[in-house]
Structure formats: C-alpha cells, structure tokens
Amino acid sequence: MEGKVDVLLTWLKKSDKFYIAPNISICESPETGRGIVLSHGSIRKNDIIVSVPSSKQLNFHTILYHISKFNKELNIPGITIDRKPINYEDNIIEAENKAWADPRYGLYSELSKEFLLSLSSFQLVSFYILVENFLLPKWTHNEIYSDWKPFFDVWPSMEELRSIPAIWNCDPNSRYHSLIEYLPAASRKHMARISGLVREDWETISEVVLKWNEIYGSLSCTKNSDKFTSDELFSLFVHVYFIINSRCLYAKIPLKIEDSPSNFTLVPYVDFMNHICESDLHCYPQLSPQLRSEGENIIGIGQFTIRCGDHLYDNINEELFLNYGAHSNDFLLNEYGFVVDGNKWNYLDISDEIIELIDDDKKEVKTFLLEHDYWGDYTINETDISYRIFVALNYYVTRDERRVRKFIEGYISEDYFKPKISSVLKELLVSLTAKYTKTLSELTEKVSNLENNLCLQNLITIYKGYIKILTQHLQDLQS
C-alpha cells in the first residue's frame, strides 16, 4: 500500500493547489486498518491537515466535466468543458484522432444530457467508477487506464468491506449471508433500507452497463475478451457502491441541491482519516466553493480542506480523527462496517417486542396509539427508556384513556404510572436480556471456530452493548 500512497501523492501534487501537512503520514494496522497519524511536531486548532483541489475530487460535477471530454454534445455551462477557448477546435481534432483507441469516445457520446442529469449522485458516481475502474481496463486489455487510477488503487477491496451487512444481503458471492439471522432489529431494518437503495440504483444504470458489456467486443477500439456476466457486474457495482457509501463526505452539489443524499464528494487522501464518536473536538471539513479553477479550467465544487479542531495533537503516532457525531453501533456497522467499544450513542430498537406484547386481538391499544402517533419506534438508550415506550405500556396496562392522554399532554408524570407498569417493563427487559445473552453465546462459540472473525466480533460488540444498557435499566427498576 505504501507504494500506492506515494503514487497517489504524486498525482495530487500535479496540482499546485494541493497541500498536505509535512508532519502526518499513513499508518496501517490489522486491527484498525489505515489511518492518518502524527509523525512529528504538533497540530493545533485550525491548522490545515490536508487540502484537496476541486479538480481532484470525484462528485456529480467533476464526473460530468470528465464525461464531456469524450462527449462533445454535452454542454452544461459552468460544469462541463468550456467549448469557447481558441484552441478548442484543435483539441476536438486531437480527440477524434484518439477515438479509435479509446472506447469512451463512442460510449460516453451515447449519454444524453437529460439522462445524466436525471441520475442521483450515487447513480452517476457508481456508474462512472464502474466503467473507469473495471470495464475500461477489461475492454482495452489494460492498455488504457482512467486518469483517476491513483485514487482507485488505494480504495478497499471487497474483502476489506466484508463486514457491511448489506453486502452480505446483496452480493451473490458473500460468504457471510448466514450472519443476517443474527442481526438485531435496528441493524436488520438499516440493512434492508440500504439493500433497497442498492438494487434501485442498479436497476437505474444497469440497462446501459449491460448493453455496453454486450457490445464492447464489436467496437473497433476493443480486443476480444470474455465479457463480464451480469452477476459479476452486479457484484462489482455492490463493491463500488459501498466504497462510495463508506468514504463520501458531505458537500453541496449545486446541480443536486434539492436531493439531500446526492450532496457528497469523494476526496483522495482525506478518506484515509477515520471517524470518532466524540462531537466537535477533532478535525473538521471546510469547502471553499469559490476555489474551482485549475489552470484555465473551472472544475467541480470547490477546494476541500480538513482543519484541526480543539484537540491538540502532540503525541507521535497519535491518530488524527474526523469529527463524526452521535451514531449507534448499528448505524456504524451498516454504513461503514465497523463498531466502537463502549459507544455512548448505542440504543436498542425494541419496537417488534413491544408491538408483539401490546397488539391485542381487538386492536384497541393499537388504535389508541395510532390516533396519538405513538405506534412504533420504541427505543432504549444508555440513560433513558423512550417516552414512547411509557405511553404504549401505560395504555396497554391501564386502558385508562383519560389519564394516558393527560400523560401525553404532560399533566401527569411518569411517577403515577411507574408502579402500575414496572412489573411488565421489568419482565420485558429480563426477557430481552436472556434473548441477547443466548445470541451472544452462540456468536462467541462461532468465533472460536473461525480465523477471520471480524464480522462476528462486530455483532458480539453490538450485543454486549445491548446487554449493558438492559442491565443498567434493570438495576434502576430494582432500586
């Protein structure tokens, strides 16, 4: 990996707008993967750690710019290549002379402005990476590579992303599909949501990808070779999707400003930085939209800079972290494939258990809770049992509509209902503790039989966190 990082830095330094602090380096370990560490000296508040020019980022705007190099009909003012320079006609002639050797001239020219703008960022970025990183080398027998190859080459392999549950669910080649049954409710719901997005995005772009895969051998600029199968293409797409999902950073994309999930960019070198659950203490991002020029060209969305926050880095080999925020281990596992021991933002989603308990034959409880918008979304965190759980159990146990309504409105405190529901609540928490302890025991037994057990260890960490939360609340009920 060290050699690939050197190539990446050489590529980035071709722009005089790239900056990297002289006292940081990449560190790699089996436990934590790659990260950025302090090599000497110190880094203080507001110091620049790394600053990446607009032209070296991958996002909706830069991809349209690069596609327009091969598609002379694609013209979006301020986004695509400027067609006005004096030497533009010469560039067109030069491009046409190269077209016989590079399939992108023919294929990207098929993409209409309307089609490209209809895509979300995830769809366009994943489509572009799939073509540039995987299809182009195969089409040309590794004779033509993307300009982005130095960036592509430092991305994680599918095996390195193996701990993300949606990959277990989506990738036909995943060896971890059997672990889905051990996912807790919150993770299972998150996995299902992401899996749906993956399949939806693939459905949107697959027609073009599959068509190109079929015709590439007939193009004069490609050499005969085995095509990818549809399963192989989908597996590659899943790989690309989770590279994007695990590395994208929030940034405003003017063409997609109304579509919140599309507002992101991929930033080389910055994506080596790991996240930490502490808020507003470590490093933070800064986007400068006014800094978009690269020579005579205007490219992308602006300079992306990482600066040091309040934390002083002055210990050699200390890892530099990006501020992350309040995310539970279920969220972290499903979005990024890792968990954090002792994560204070953990919570349990016990909606299924509560609904199973209170959903009576006459649907009386459900009707009342639906009318008052308290049906579902029942959670417990380290310090609190959610108000929604109290509302649900209060009505389930007492069926006292008048008093429960007053409780909802804040006129009656929890103290009135607590003695009435404590036995039911305690029984529920004891049952959950036993359930999670049993699952934890099964997972622990599985771990001892495997060499590579990262996926299992992550699940074990989640269940240990659950049991810790339940134990704390059971102690509170008994005190």
From Swiss-Prot:
Residues binding S-adenosyl-L-methionine: 324
InterPro entries, per database record: SET_dom, SET_dom_sf, SET_MeTrfase, SETD3_SETD6_MTase, SETD4_SET
Keywords for this protein: Methyltransferase, S-adenosyl-L-methionine, Transferase
EC id: 2.1.1.-
GO MF term list: histone H3K36 methyltransferase activity; histone H3K4 methyltransferase activity; protein-lysine N-methyltransferase activity; transcription coactivator activity
GO terms for biological process, alphabetical: methylation; positive regulation of transcription by RNA polymerase II
Enzyme class: transferase
All residue ranges annotated as the SET domain in the record: 22-325
Keyword S-adenosyl-L-methionine: yes
Described function: S-adenosyl-L-methionine-dependent protein-lysine N-methyltransferase that trimethylates 60S ribosomal protein L12 (RPL12A and RPL12B) at 'Lys-4' and 'Lys-11'.
Family membership: Belongs to the class V-like SAM-binding methyltransferase superfamily. RKM2 family.
Note: Present with 768 molecules/cell in log phase SD medium.
Protein name: Ribosomal lysine N-methyltransferase 2
Phylogenetic lineage: Eukaryota, Fungi, Dikarya, Ascomycota, Saccharomycotina
